[in-house]
Every structure is written in C-alpha cells, then in structure tokens.
C-alpha cells in the first residue's frame, strides 16, 4: 500500500514531526508539503527541514500543485489557511485531517458542512 500524504504547515513544529512519521512508515509516502507564501522555507526540501535528509519533496505555496494526486492531507497550518485548504480537499475528494487549534465558530461551521 502506498498512501500519498500531503502536509499543510510543513515547516512548523508539528509539520516537521509529521514528515518524520510519514517517512518512517513503509505504507505512507510524503507527496506534498505546503506553506504560506511568505514562509522562508519555500523551495527547500521538506526532509532537510525536518532534519532527516533529502526526500525530494520541496515545500511549496502553490495550493493547486500541492493538492494534485494526494490521498490524504494533514493540516497543521494557521487558521487563516484552513478554509482554502479544506475547500480544495473537498473539491478533489481528498481525505482531510485537521490538527490546527484555535478555530472560531465560522471555521467549525465550515468543517461541519464539509464533513
């Protein structure tokens, strides 16, 4: 089995931890790493950022490219990015796991609507 995983908020503390977990699991393949357009790690290899060496998956801010051909997205990005990430996942029939905290009622309503 080869589950293609994408991580939103890939350069943050949780994102880096998830990169390590995905890399260590033989059934998972890191297929995307997404960050905000002002992130200093854009274009860098996600494995290098996570401290495990090159994985060949660079951090991008291009949501359309990121969501291309993923099975599941794990989102630990900011509350500002959740709405667009969730909408893209739903549109592309991609499973979506949200770990971001501090959600307001509007985001909770959107999550419930998309569930």
Protein language model annotation of sequence segments:
Residues 1-91:
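N-terminal glycine-/serine-/threonine-rich beta1-alpha1-beta2 phosphate-ribose binding loop
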Residues 30, 96-97:
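Hydrophobic beta-strand scaffold residues
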């Amino acid at each position: 089995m080869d589950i293609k995983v994408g991580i939103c908020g890939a350069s943050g503390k949780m994102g880096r931890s998830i990169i390590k977990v995905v890399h260590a699991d033989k059934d998972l393949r890191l297929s995307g790493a997404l960050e905000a357009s002002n992130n200093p790690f854009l274009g860098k290899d996600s494995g290098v950022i996570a401290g495990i060496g090159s994985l060949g998956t660079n951090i991008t801010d291009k949501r359309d490219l990121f969501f291309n051909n993923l099975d599941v997205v794990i989102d630990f990005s900011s509350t500002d990015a959740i709405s667009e990430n969730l909408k893209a996942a739903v549109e592309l029939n991609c499973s979506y796991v949200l770990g971001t905290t501090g959600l307001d009622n509007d985001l909770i309503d959107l999550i419930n609507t998309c569930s």
